[in-house]
Amino acid sequence: MRVALSSEGVFPLAHGEATAVGASVSGTLQGEGILVGMPSLFVRLAGCNLRCEFRGVDGSVAYCDTPHAQRTSGGSVQEVAEVMQVVVEHLGALRHVVITGGEPMLQAEAVAELCQALKAGRDGLHITLETNGTIFGEEVAEAVDLVSVSPKRQKETFVEGRPSHDYVLSLQQWLDAKRGGRDALQLKFVVGRREDEVRLIDPLLSALEGWERFPVVIMPMGGDSTTMRASEPVAVEMAIRRGWRYTPRLQVDLWGGRKGT
């Protein structure tokens, strides 16, 4: 089976020179969520079913921080076995792999096969799937250790101010599939202004059952330090007031959000 990768593909890889994070070995740090700071290797797939935009406290608009992964053009198509081999060969001491995009679940069958191959190729490997939650896949849910769901309020997911039936159904399927473990799923919300709480977070949580057993993570909007700094106070205040976890974006703090980090 073949899988479409973004231009980053498996990253960051060391080929005799420093990687984008300035290291001489392959890997980076997970920048977000409950595993923030965890040494990891990333696999970025190509293609996304959303075109996200976010608004900040000053009315500024931020867009997807990985636009190069929105479409399949500009990347490569490889056999799952080839991707697995590259990952395993560059893991070194790493025990965490992150499957991200784009939206990986557009290639659910290939993702399931890749995760199964990775687990067979390296004992004790932990796999995180990063997804917007619009597409559920039972095989993928069974194959990964952590589902990192980042819900989005876009025209494809919300209708007349409420989350669509299909979106709620898909998110609920993810929650139900991972209900056996608290750290098997996280709900990671990008926050740019206070209105995001009543426009995105509360409507979604009120439509879902059993979300309380999983971590809710609040993350400031911004693929660059200037935008992120402006939204941090809102995210911090919301996390404290609601008793949720706050996450930084280490890839922005440490490396300016540049590609390959």
Go through each PLM region and give its residues.
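A short catalytic or substrate-binding loop motif that flags glycine-/basic-rich loops and adjacent residues
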Residues: 34-36
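Short secondary-structure capping/turn segments at boundaries of alpha-helices and beta-strands
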Residues: 27-32
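Short, basic/aromatic-enriched C-terminal tail that caps enzymatic domains
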Residues: 1-26, 242-261
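Conserved AdoMet/S-adenosylmethionine-binding subsite of the radical SAM
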Residues: 84, 105-261
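Aromatic-flanked redox-active Cys/Sec active sites in thiol-based oxidoreductases
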Residues: 45-46
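Conserved Radical SAM active-site core
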Residues: 3, 8-10, 15-16, 22-25, ...
